[in-house]
Amino acid sequence: MKKVDVKESAVGRETRIRKQWNEQSIFEQSIQNREGAQSFVFYEGPPTANGLPHVGHALGRTIKDVVARYKTMVGYKVLRKAGWDTHGLPVELGVEKQLGISGKHEIEEYGIEPFIQKCKESVFTYEKQWREFTESIGYWVDMDDPYVTLENPYIESVWHILGTIHEKGLLYKGHRVSPYCPSCQTSLSSHEVAQGYKTVKDLSATVKFEVKDSENEYFLGWTTTPWTLPANVALAVHPNMEYVKAKQEGHVYIVAKERVQDVLKEDYEVLSVHKGEELVNTSYMPPFPMKEVTNGYHVIAADFVTADSGTGLVHIAPAYGEDDYRVVQSEGLSFLHVVDEKGEYTEAVPFLKGKFVKDCDVDIVRYLAKEGLLYHKEKYEHSYPHCWRCDSPLLYYAGESWLIRTTAIKDTFLQNNDSVTWYPDHMKHGRFGKFLENMVDWNISRNRYWGTPLNVWECESCDHQFAPKSIADLRKHSTKETPEDLELHKPYVDEVQVCCEKCGGTMTRTPEVIDVWFDSGSMPFAQYHYPFENKELFEEQFPADVIAEGIDQTRGWFYSLLAVSALYTGKAPYKRVLSLGHVLDEEGQKMSKSKGNALDPVDLVEKFGADALRWALLVDSAPWNAKRFSERTVLEAKSKFVDTLINVYSFYVLYANLDEYNPHETYDVKRTKLDEWVLSRLHSTTKKVRTALDDYQFTNAAREIAALVDEVSNWYVRRSRNRFWESGMNAEKAAAYETLHEVLVTISKLIAPFTPFVAEDIHVNLTGNSVHLEDYPVVNESLLQPKLEAEMNAVLQVVELGRSNRNQHSLKVKQPLAELVLLEHNENDMDWESYRDIVMDELNVKTFHVELDETKYTSYQLKLNFKKAGPKFGKNVNAVNGWLKQLSQAEVQNFVSTERAVYEVASGEEVVVTAEDVMVEKVAKSGFSNTTNGQYTVMLDTNVTEELLQEGVAREFIRAVQEYRKQLNLPVNLRVDVILDTEEELQQTLTNHKELLKENLLVKQFTFGHLTNEDDELSLGETKVRIKLSSAN
């Protein structure tokens, strides 16, 4: 076995391992070895390569890699196809910035074709960084044969899906109000909008709408979007709600009865009460009269009006609200549009023409105040949608869009979701399920350039539509020969004209591209160019057994996958969804570059290694929980887990090489109870880890492994060191080597999905084989010994209590103590005699015994809990307190047992004192200190005699010399002669313990003499010791 370089950096080790993997094609072999096995399917959510990875990507890639590696090791064939999301507005915006242009007008001036080419060139700007990041973090995914959403085969599959949806009558062109980004100048779908809500404070206004032909009488309407008021065409009331006419300061106001107090506040007189339906058709004077409104400016009835907020009257601007649009359509009212595609007022509002509407709320309110039409204004905090791509506030515009009738198959969506297992479970019928319940038809079209062209051709003569499902289908209907290498992007497909089969007229393609979420939602099919190729492969790889992405994909990719599959096949595209929580900074704030609190995962890997980063992300908390994260978290994972494991592995290799131990040879072995215990722990942990991983409980699995590694390092190896240090090879020493070898090899397999680099390093060095080509460990039931594990756990508890006891009294473990007494509080069949030597050695005590009668070593004190007892006993509280203090120990013991006592106060009244009235404090016998965990109490004799003190000094000297040997890098088996120069008192102490020193320090001869300043010096508290070592071999 190669010597372990414990000083090798994590990134150095991982680079070396990656090189091995590449040279030996380990990733490819891991898949080939499962050829013919049952498939386990996961889908890679496609990132965009025009932005750099962040810590959230590290979490997602870690989880997916753990799943894929684990499932491979338990026998499945797991294909791992990478993907790239290459279309969409972020790409266009990046190119605009690069070219120094902005907006559609300048794009079209620049030229659509060159612009599209620039987009194509830019999408892989950071591909190299993504590939390096993916490899450095140990995520095994096929990046040499990815699916790419801009490629013709992918787009052709998307066209087949859209053509099928059109064929089903579910794709239609409609005029409706949709969320619109004036900055990007395109509409958005409802699931895109759901990703971008922010809490903002906007100026709200309560507006006076003067009743026509009535003096000083006004309807009061409240709005949080004053900018929509110039487009007002009606006021809406609920027909069954009660409204009042109330007089205030000479004016009469009409407002919902339930809202009058909140709106008018005070000093008003209710004149009359009316049903909403009585107010219908009442005309009013609009604050911004428009001659285009030939049917409007009167009250209408609408069921969506409530009295939850505002005035109970809703101002209706049909161009900018979904409910408004619907009710105006049904009422046949005029339609008014006063805003252009850039979100600026048109000449319809002359005094604000060319201004961005969201910046004009103050101007509108000032105008209303000037005209005497403002009743009240205030800042109003509410949730408002923003563009998920550019962060601009959205507007709601009425316009023509292509929509998919998702509402027509809503039941299919809901049924498919019911078949899915969600992690966490509450997402299923919570965040995701509620979104499905409230779905609207999917606005699929975007008035942009760089995207999958919507494959619908419309006849200029008869409006007939044709939706080709393939390139061949398009060629077949084309009016002229199309190029063999036709690229399925604007402007190339726009040049293809089709002959209308209905009237013989010319059909041209509708100019829109599609929602990029439809692109990525089509990947189960399009990644294999289905249905044109790979039908068997597709059927083998559909649906996914699991997908895993960030929680922000709930209304993104998770939804689009479900929607596309339901529309196309009627089936759910996945069986399980792992919805991963946000990775926050250590203060619980969302990470962002602008705040300066973002962690770069590439930097973290460089500093601490990928294993440490992966382990930190997994062991901290369940991946679907939001987690606070920092460099400290990763450093802790490295030191507590990765480095601990490497130290154990290094220890084994060092001594096995010294003893020329060969795990492939047969030795006479005699396993100790400690060996049996660690093997039982190994296999019980294996059982728990497999159960956890089968249920995707990664954190539970990681914590089980962490506990095992800690116990192997800090208990098994430490308790076995003397066996490894013995000269020669006896049966117990061979058993220690055999056991630790088995433990390390099995642990390397257990951790292979979690920390693949250190797992590989250990396994290759100990066995010669890649751990990633091995099967996952299975439980050997014959090695499980629950009783032994329980007993050793009890020993560990007692040792931990003893250490805590020593710490409380600043007594180092190197300082021997005379006695340890163990008090047991629960009956059990623990055979402490079998573990006497371990406890005594671990806690460095001369005697140890178990005591059942705790009164020999402890007494109790009762103190009144005044917070509880004061109100209960009132004026008698001080008398009760005095009585408690003078109780005998027998009476105190009785109270502790019964938790009840009766005391007669001076007045003759009896008061009952119970456990909740009293605080019970356990006091150790004089000269002893105690620590307890409820099950055990450890009593230590803290009196240190001169003899014990001297032995403690000798043991502290042993520690100092062992540390000194490490600093000199002396071989661990090198025997030395020691010359010491120190004061006489310390010389005598060390002489008295010469055999103890020789036994622990591999010393052949101790002498005392004069050493010069050139020799090294050790410190033992205040005492200095000069020392010189020389080889005695």
Curated annotation (Swiss-Prot):
<keyword id="KW-0436">Ligase</keyword>
<keyword id="KW-0479">Metal-binding</keyword>
<dbReference type="InterPro" id="IPR013155">
    <property type="entry name" value="M/V/L/I-tRNA-synth_anticd-bd"/>
</dbReference>
<dbReference type="InterPro" id="IPR002300">
    <property type="entry name" value="aa-tRNA-synth_Ia"/>
</dbReference>
<dbReference type="GO" id="GO:0008270">
    <property type="term" value="F:zinc ion binding"/>
</dbReference>
<dbReference type="InterPro" id="IPR023586">
    <property type="entry name" value="Ile-tRNA-ligase_type2"/>
</dbReference>
<dbReference type="Pfam" id="PF19302">
    <property type="entry name" value="DUF5915"/>
</dbReference>
<dbReference type="GO" id="GO:0002161">
    <property type="term" value="F:aminoacyl-tRNA deacylase activity"/>
</dbReference>
<protein>
    <recommendedName>
        <fullName>Isoleucine--tRNA ligase</fullName>
        <ecNumber>6.1.1.5</ecNumber>
    </recommendedName>
</protein>
<dbReference type="GO" id="GO:0006428">
    <property type="term" value="P:isoleucyl-tRNA aminoacylation"/>
</dbReference>
<keyword id="KW-0862">Zinc</keyword>
<dbReference type="InterPro" id="IPR014729">
    <property type="entry name" value="Rossmann-like_a/b/a_fold"/>
</dbReference>
<dbReference type="InterPro" id="IPR033709">
    <property type="entry name" value="Anticodon_Ile_ABEc"/>
</dbReference>
<keyword id="KW-0963">Cytoplasm</keyword>
<keyword id="KW-0547">Nucleotide-binding</keyword>
<dbReference type="Pfam" id="PF08264">
    <property type="entry name" value="Anticodon_1"/>
</dbReference>
<dbReference type="GO" id="GO:0005524">
    <property type="term" value="F:ATP binding"/>
</dbReference>
<dbReference type="InterPro" id="IPR001412">
    <property type="entry name" value="aa-tRNA-synth_I_CS"/>
</dbReference>
<dbReference type="InterPro" id="IPR009080">
    <property type="entry name" value="tRNAsynth_Ia_anticodon-bd"/>
</dbReference>
<feature type="short sequence motif" description="'KMSKS' region">
    <location>
        <begin position="590"/>
        <end position="594"/>
    </location>
</feature>
<dbReference type="GO" id="GO:0000049">
    <property type="term" value="F:tRNA binding"/>
</dbReference>
<feature type="short sequence motif" description="'HIGH' region">
    <location>
        <begin position="47"/>
        <end position="57"/>
    </location>
</feature>
<feature type="binding site">
    <location>
        <position position="593"/>
    </location>
    <ligand>
        <name>ATP</name>
    </ligand>
</feature>
<dbReference type="GO" id="GO:0004822">
    <property type="term" value="F:isoleucine-tRNA ligase activity"/>
</dbReference>
<comment type="similarity">
    <text>Belongs to the class-I aminoacyl-tRNA synthetase family. IleS type 2 subfamily.</text>
</comment>
<dbReference type="GO" id="GO:0005737">
    <property type="term" value="C:cytoplasm"/>
</dbReference>
<keyword id="KW-0030">Aminoacyl-tRNA synthetase</keyword>
<keyword id="KW-0648">Protein biosynthesis</keyword>
<dbReference type="InterPro" id="IPR002301">
    <property type="entry name" value="Ile-tRNA-ligase"/>
</dbReference>
<dbReference type="Pfam" id="PF00133">
    <property type="entry name" value="tRNA-synt_1"/>
</dbReference>
<comment type="function">
    <text>Catalyzes the attachment of isoleucine to tRNA(Ile). As IleRS can inadvertently accommodate and process structurally similar amino acids such as valine, to avoid such errors it has two additional distinct tRNA(Ile)-dependent editing activities. One activity is designated as 'pretransfer' editing and involves the hydrolysis of activated Val-AMP. The other activity is designated 'posttransfer' editing and involves deacylation of mischarged Val-tRNA(Ile).</text>
</comment>
<keyword id="KW-0067">ATP-binding</keyword>
<comment type="subunit">
    <text>Monomer.</text>
</comment>
<dbReference type="InterPro" id="IPR009008">
    <property type="entry name" value="Val/Leu/Ile-tRNA-synth_edit"/>
</dbReference>
